[in-house]
Swiss-Prot record:
Nucleotidyltransferase listed as a keyword: yes
Gene source species: Lactobacillus delbrueckii subsp. bulgaricus (strain ATCC BAA-365 / Lb-18)
Family membership: Belongs to the RNA polymerase beta chain family.
GO molecular-function terms, A-Z: DNA binding; DNA-directed RNA polymerase activity; ribonucleoside binding
NCBIfam families documented for this protein: PRK00405.1 (NF001616), rpoB (TIGR02013)
Keyword Nuclease: no
Gene from which this protein is expressed: rpoB
A Gene Ontology term for the protein's cellular component: DNA-directed RNA polymerase complex
Subunit structure: The RNAP catalytic core consists of 2 alpha, 1 beta, 1 beta' and 1 omega subunit. When a sigma factor is associated with the core the holoenzyme is formed, which can initiate transcription.
Region (Disordered): 1176-1221
PANTHER family reported for this sequence: DNA-DIRECTED RNA POLYMERASE I SUBUNIT 2 (PTHR20856)
The protein's name in its UniProt record: DNA-directed RNA polymerase subunit beta
């Protein structure tokens, strides 16, 4: 009997799973994080924004513009058409507005076009200008009130408070070394804290003391805050002090000061806590959290019956709080109303809730705890009650009452998803539009004006376009494979507008926090400067209405202490109140705990507790990690650094032409493929009637016919092949949501990123030194690791000042053989095989020539002769871009295509490359065990097993111990056993096969029980000295392929200032020979080599031209001249006012070349090319005389080709020369 149990993943794959924990909660849809948020935006978000900004009234109150409703019309293009036409997939938005004229009572209602709103595709992406993009969710600090504490150099704890709104002015409180409290309003200079309280209308010291009670800090602060101007009351003076900080130097009155403070904090248009901010403020200042653990200094009674709830001296524990909880929510329980003076900011009574407790430090000292009362959730502004309660919390922190906040805690960080980001952007646009509307209301005639005339939609359209086009959070979708796509949609970034910047982010914010458990993956994050700032959402995490991450837990019954199937989703700050056991905790059949003492989590500690103290238990072990990390088998046996690499490598796997699912999987592959959006899913139950490569037809049970069209060989964002293949056959029964066609990198409905080669951990003639990989030629011959790459090239025919460019077959100075694959219009035919430099689209551009005379113009009009000079600007295949032409698309204005201004015709050519695995390509397993291919050996030379099976890949065993990714060893043993048994297995993360399970499985499969085998050398037939670990590991080919990186340069472009070659493949640049490389040549005394590298091959402008000339003529190369960089240095010093001259050995001044005067030294390589051409022709003529007539024909063809090359070179160098001048 084999270990494990059989699990079906979809309709087409069965695996033997080693999991022990039953999955009681299905995985949520993995792209909901995007789609649900956008749905909320359309259903509620848009209305919210309009309700925030509208109604708009003019200053005199004659006209009011109100929002009624909005609707989206049908999109102009479908998703596929948007891709093809480089358009945005969007729908026109029409808003119904109502304009009321209060003088006449007339109401005008009108539908106004508000621009196009980009729509989300079914899979959660957007198509903007033909490219698929994803809006990444942002992890930001939540609005709310935060308390901090740090120790000064004397060891005293200094506290601070920040009230952060969603938008608007910040309010900060702080203490100094003398224990005086200060306030900063909107990050200005500080004022004594009492000034803010006085500005609320509580002017006298006695009023302030009555509200806050006695405290040393408060007394010192009041002493500091002296009455400077007896002419003003204390309230008026306080208002003016704040005005002075916000607008220094401006004349101030009590009224202007009051209205400024009102507009900063109490005007909903300028200050917004948002629903989440109000929730956080209410929660932080509520007495429920603050009373726990303190002794009451007064008796609490029921306001209706007078029954004592808790007597004075009672310690408030959880049981007492259960009694008080409902009373604390009542408006008539322990509430106190304070009446401010009429001069205050808001002269209305302030109601707060107060309860007295005893201090812990001085037991007989009474402390007053003040909460902000019961402020409704829809109050988005801060209120005087909030300010009083937050000041009280701040003052009581000095007495040791209350907690300071951890800003990296996920209870204090929230997620802004697509819907909210888009809503904020729309709000910015509408706020800009509001100003325009107000202006137009005052200018235009009230009797005749319509809503349409008041509205200017440019700011709204502009802000939405700007967001999708250039925001840091709007990213080009990673479309390497379905896993990369899915991960991109679930990514959480702390960067972006309103977030952190990577330069200022410290270690704390990047580090894994205990609240990440089940919410953010502790493993998957990029290596490099963004580490820890970009995270991935955990598999089971969801986002609540406030934007906080929640993770599910199974409830443990308080009565029976047994685990129930009741699921609760908890936010990070709710979880802090509970003790939680791990999912692997042993349970009895009835749900009770096996052990008497259980290791659990409480906040950041691991605690050992008895079962009666446990509140919750994890749902499943994989809830801790992200989708990508959950695809790594034996993750628990890998070091975290390598696990991080393994997760990142899977996203870089290239889709292969014949992928296979992993023999050793985790069970996550099916859901990853299903939810990625790349698989084709059945929309209803039914039976398959027809299948071919392009479409599948399914007859539903109600007899309607669904036709599904498959994507064939489309270029993905990452220039990979996006192709769907059927996963069903005729007569199959399908169910709703079933995978009926695999996407790229999928097989049998599962994610299939690589292949299952036979791998041996052995060295082989030093070829796999330092992470190099040795492959068998079988992998090349049988196309095991072959992938298809599709690149597109565009050629635009524009209007120029000298006339329109023309797409034509008649290209000057190009031989007939270069045009053999072009059609009559000069466009390459589909199916043609093209190589570097071949013409794809023939195009000519008018050259700048003198104006034609009247006679020439007449001749031209009559005979239509080509009197005009044109130059060849054809689209050619770039270096390394050769392949087969897959498709050609032509867009013209005549056909009604939308083209960019000035473009008459656009031709797009798609070229396909079939890339086999080759030396230099990067490969990796799922455990961060990456390497590059160093040798592809013939199959007969590869080491082979006793049964004659040759090994496919040899990896260096030295790559394992120091890296500590032992998961790969367990994987090869399990893989070998699975291959021997002909089955697929699943070993879920943290709940998979143990080491004992692996060895049992290996023994049952009948292979060597130590996982090793005798290996024979393929060249000699001799066995290797030691037994070798051999098995099957899932191995991937990554996107870093040598074909994209290999590059060589002979003649190319130069930098204008330094005259040195440019760098990089894209610029056709040279190789940098840096300071350390110069030292190396100096060390070897290689003077001549060094000299030519620093002169001819770099920036000796005259010398390099003369060297080229000498090579062409076959002469000796002259001595090098002065490098251009020396001249630049001299000019730099001269520009600083230093009179610097260069002298030769005889102390005569050397004149340095001046670019503008000495244009001859900028020798044109054209002349040299022509010289080379002439010599070539002469040579050919001599050969022609000697050889026979058949060879003559051949010779002329060569000459044509040489001529075409020389002309191309001439055009190129002429352009370069012009640029450098």
């Amino acid at each position: 009997m084999l270990n494990g149990h059989v699990v079906n993943y979809g309709q087409h794959r069965t695996r033997r799973s080693f999991s022990r924990i039953k999955e009681i909660l299905p995985l949520p849809n993995l792209t909901d994080v995007q789609t649900e948020s956008y749905k909320w935006f359309l259903d509620e978000g848009v209305k919210e924004v309009f309700d925030d900004i509208l109604p708009i009234s003019d200053t005199s109150g004659r006209l009011t513009l109100e929002y009624v409703d909005y609707k989206l019309q049908e999109p102009k293009y479908t998703v596929d058409e948007s891709r093809k036409h480089d358009a945005t997939y969007s729908a026109p938005m029409h808003v119904t507005l109502k304009l009321t004229n209060h003088e006449t009572g007339e109401i005008k209602t009108q539908d106004v076009f508000f621009g196009d709103l980009p729509l989300m595709t079914k899979s959660g992406s957007f198509i903007v200008n033909g490219a698929e993009r994803v809006i990444v969710s942002q992890l930001v600090r939540s609005p709310g009130v935060y308390y901090s504490g740090e120790f000064d150099k004397n060891g005293r704890q200094i506290f601070g408070t920040t009230v952060i709104p969603n938008r608007g002015a910040w309010l900060e409180f702080e203490t100094d070394a003398k224990n005086i409290s200060y306030v900063r309003v909107d990050r200005t200079r500080k004022l004594p804290l009492s000034v803010l309280v006085r500005a609320l209308g509580f002017g006298s010291d006695s009023e302030i003391k009555e509200i806050f009670g006695d405290s040393d800090t408060l007394d010192l602060t009041l002493d500091k805050d002296v009455h400077k101007n007896p002419a003003d009351s204390r309230v008026a003076e306080a208002l003016k002090d704040i005005y002075d900080r916000l607008r220094p130097g401006e004349p101030k009155t009590t009224d202007s000061s009051r209205s400024l403070l009102v507009s900063r904090f109490f005007d909903p248009r300028r200050y917004d806590l948002a629903a989440v901010g109000r929730y956080k403020v209410n929660k932080k200042l509520s007495l429920k959290n603050r009373l726990l653990g303190y002794t009451l200094a007064e008796t609490l009674a029921d306001p209706d019956t007078g029954e004592v709830l808790a007597a004075k001296g009672t310690v408030v524990n959880n049981e007492v709080m259960d009694v008080l909880k409902d009373y604390l929510d009542r408006d008539d329980f322990k509430t106190v109303t304070y009446t401010p003076s009429d001069e205050g900011v808001i002269p209305e009574p302030v109601t707060v809730q107060e309860i007295k407790v005893f201090s812990r430090e001085i037991p007989d000292r009474e402390i007053k705890l003040i909460s902000n009362g019961h402020i409704a959730e829809d109050v988005k502004c801060i209120t005087p009650a909030d300010i009083i309660a937050s000041v009280n919390y701040f003052l009581e922190l000095q007495e040791g009452v209350g907690n300071i906040d951890d800003i990296d805690h996920l209870g204090n960080r929230r997620i802004r998803r697509v819907g909210e980001l888009l809503q904020n952007q729309m709000r910015i646009g509408l706020a800009r539009m509001e100003r325009v509307v107000r202006e137009r209301m005052s200018i235009q005639d009230a009797a005749t004006v319509t809503p349409q005339q008041l509205i200017n939609i440019r700011p709204i359209v502009g802000s939405i376009k700007e967001f999708f086009g250039s925001s840091q959070l709007s990213q080009f979708m990673d479309q390497n494979n379905p896993l990369g796509e899915l991960t991109h949609k679930r990514r959480m970034s702390a960067l972006g507008p309103g977030g952190l910047s990577r330069d200022r982010a410290g270690y704390e914010v990047r580090d894994v926090h205990y609240t990440h458990y089940g919410r953010l993956c502790p493993i998957e994050t990029p290596e490099g400067p963004n580490i820890g700032l970009i995270n991935s959402m955990a598999t089971y995490a969801i986002i609540n209405k406030y934007g906080f991450l929640e993770t599910p837990y199974r409830r443990v019954s308080w009565a029976t202490h047994k685990v129930t199937d009741k699921i609760d989703y908890l936010t990070a700050d709710e979880e802090d109140n509970y003790i939680i056991a791990g999912a692997n905790t042993p349970l009895n059949e009835d749900g009770s705990f096996v052990d008497d003492v259980i290791l659990c989590r409480h906040r950041e500690d691991n605690v050992e507790v008895s079962p009666d103290r446990i509140d919750y238990i994890d749902v499943i072990p994989k809830q801790v990690v992200s989708v990508t990390s959950a695809c790594i088998p034996f993750l628990e046996n890998d070091d975290s650094n390598r696990a991080l690499m393994g997760a990142n490598h899977q996203r870089q796997a290239v889709p292969l032409i014949n992928p296979h699912g992993p023999l050793v999987a985790t069970g996550m592959e099916y859901r990853a493929g299903h939810d990625s959006g790349d698989a084709l899913l059945a929309e209803a139950d039914g039976e398959v009637e027809y299948v071919d490569a392009n479409e599948i037809r399914v007859r539903r049970e109600d007899q309607t016919l669904d036709t599904y069209t498959l994507e064939k060989y489309r270029r993905s964002n990452a220039t990979k092949n996006y192709n769907q293949t059927p996963n069903v056959k005729r007569g199959d029964k399908v169910v709703d949501g079933q995978v009926i066609a695999n996407g790229p990198s999928m097989a049998d409905g599962e994610l299939a990123l690589g292949q299952n080669p036979v791998i041996a951990f052995t060295t082989w003639n030093m070829y796999n030194f330092e992470d190099a990989i040795m492959l068998s030629e079988r992998l090349v011959k049988e196309d095991v690791y072959t992938s298809i790459h599709i690149e597109d090239y565009d050629s635009e025919a524009r209007d120029t000042k000298l006339g329109p460019e023309e797409i034509t077959r008649e290209i000057p100075n190009v031989g007939e053989d270069a045009l053999k694959d072009l059609d009559e219009n000069g466009i390459i035919r589909i199916g043609a095989e093209v190589h570097d430099g071949d013409i794809l689209v023939g195009k000519v551009t008018p050259k700048g020539i003198t104006e034609l005379s009247a006679e020439e113009r007449l001749l031209h009009a009559i005979f239509g002769e080509k009197a005009r000079e044109v130059r060849d600007t054809s689209l050619r295949v770039p270096h390394g871009g050769g392949g087969v032409v897959q498709d050609v698309q032509v867009f013209t204005r005549e056909a009604g295509d939308e083209l960019a201004p000035g473009v008459n015709t656009l031709v797009r050519v798609y070229i396909v490359q079939k890339r086999k695995i080759q030396v230099g390509d990067k490969m990796s397993g799922r455990h961060g065990n990456k390497g590059t291919v160093a040798l592809i050996a013939p199959v007969e030379d590869m080491p082979y097993l006793p049964d004659g099976t040759p090994v496919d890949i040899c990896l260096n065993p030295m790559g394992v111990p120091s890296r500590m990714n032992i998961g790969q060893l367990l994987e090869i043993h399990l893989g070998r056993a699975a291959r021997a048994l002909g089955i697929h297995v699943a070993t879920p993360v943290f709940d998979g096969a143990s080491e004992d399970d692996v060895w049992d499985f290996v023994r049952e499969a009948g292979v060597d029980s130590d996982g090793k085998t005798v290996l024979y050398d393929g060249r000699t037939g001799e066995p290797f000295h030691n037994r070798v670990s051999v098995g099957v590991m899932y191995y991937l080919k990554l996107t870093h392929m040598v074909d994209d990186k290999i590059h060589a340069r002979s003649i190319g472009p130069y930098s204008l200032v330094t005259q040195q070659p440019l760098g990089g493949k894209a610029q056709f640049g040279g190789q940098r020979f840096g300071e350390m490389e110069v030292w190396a040549l100096e060390a070897y005394g290689a003077a001549y080599t060094l000299q030519e590298i620093l002169t001819y091959k770099s920036d000796d402008v005259v010398g390099r031209v003369k060297a080229y000339e000498a090579i062409v003529k076959g002469e000796r190369i002259t001595k090098p001249g002065v490098p251009e960089s020396f001249r630049v240095l001299v000019k730099e010093l001269q520009s600083l006012g230093l009179d610097l001259r260069v002298l030769d050995s005889d102390e005569n001044e050397v004149e340095l070349r001046d670019m503008d005067e000495d244009s001859n030294e900028h020798v044109n390589i054209d002349a040299l090319s022509r010289l080379a051409e002439a010599q070539e022709k002469k040579k050919l003529a001599e050969e022609e005389a000697e050889i026979a007539a058949e060879a003559e024909a051949e010779g002329s063809a060569e000459e044509d080709a040489a001529e075409a090359d020389a002309d191309a070179n001439e055009a190129e160098t002429a352009d370069d020369d012009k640029a450098s001048k």
